[in-house]
Amino acid sequence: MTTDKIEYRKRAAFINRQEELNFLKNYVDEEPETFLFLHGPKSSGKTTLLYKVLNQIEEEQKTDVKFLNLRKIFTEFPEDYNYKDFLRLLFNVGEEKKGKLTGEINVGFFKINTEIEKKIYQGRVDPFKVIEKEFIKLHQKGIKPILIIDELQALDKIYMNNGRDRRLIIELFNFFVAMTKEDHLAYIIIASSDGYFLNTVYNDSKLKKCSKFYKVDYLPKEDVMEWLLNLEKYSKIKDYTLTKPDAEKIWETVGGSMWEIQDILSEMFGKPLDEVLQLYKKKMRSLIVAYVVKPEQKKIERLLRHFVDRDELPMEEINSEDEKLLRDMVRQNIIYFDPTEAAYYPQGKSYHHGIRLYFKR
């Protein structure tokens, strides 16, 4: 549903990203030979970027896109979701045409008939073969199949048919290799902010030869300044404007994190900028305090202290005990781990502020 005719006092902005858009377009313009991992810190704009580039690509060439946003979908499932839950989100029962698969797949799922559905759940039909047939059919029609999975790590603990011998994620990777490197049938794009999950893939010798990694980072300063000094153009904000010093203050507080900038702009409808930023910094400090106060407090403080005067912590500077603590910080989105650099970073400027303020107490 389009919302272009609805008036809002602030809209979500999309700023530049031309380099990233060009990279993704070039990926889809070449014959599929590798599957692509989009990685980067939380809220760096990976999902928004994918939606944007897909809209542009669909206007220029024939594509058939399946976009599985697992972060969104699995909120509907219980914590102990299993293989059958995955099948339910992957396949939809569509029109039946003489017992064969229909080809109208435009909503992010693969449509199948009831007979195929029954055989899949009985284990008599390999679901990956069903998807492969659909890719072949599209390929023969001159249509490019594009499969995008956002936050793939949500499937990391699922086993096939509830057994403990075949992990679903491994079978998916084998399928991705077959569809790209071996058969050149489809484009596979995986987006994730879980650096540890991606590190497993990045250091797997087999998968490393079949995949590409591309980092989507926060916006650079010049793009943030362009946005904040032209709020009506990019965010449709008419209620207030920002001066260059105002924009500098926002940059120094949250950097290029678009989600956090949007949040600050929303708060400014009711409060002056300095008050908004002061409250924001206090909030970030309180998040660090809430995380640190636990039995391992002294050990956590020792690790976080690394970031008071520096931006990164290389993996070679830590030991196995440190790694366990840092792993939890990554999962709680306090720290970001970059698998391509083997280094830890605060989860953006705002968390960096929170860490520094914590040690100023």
Where are the language model's segments positioned?
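Structured catalytic cores of enzymes that bind and process phosphorylated ligands/cofactors
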Residues: 38, 47-50, 64-67, 165-169, ...
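Conserved nucleotide-binding/hydrolysis micro-motifs of P-loop NTPases
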Residues: 72-75, 154, 194-198, 220-224, ...
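Conserved small helical "lid"/interfacial subdomain of P-loop NTPases
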Residues: 211-246, 250-255, 259, 264
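Conserved Walker B catalytic segment
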Residues: 120-206, 211, 324
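Short, conserved phosphate/pyrophosphate- and ester-handling motifs at nucleotide-, phospho-/glycolipid
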Residues: 17, 47, 257, 348
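A short, basic N-terminal segment
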Residues: 1-41, 55-61, 70-73, 196, ...
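Winged-helix-like regulatory helical subdomains adjacent to P-loop NTPase cores
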Residues: 250, 258-332
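P-loop NTPase nucleotide-binding core
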Residues: 30-162, 330
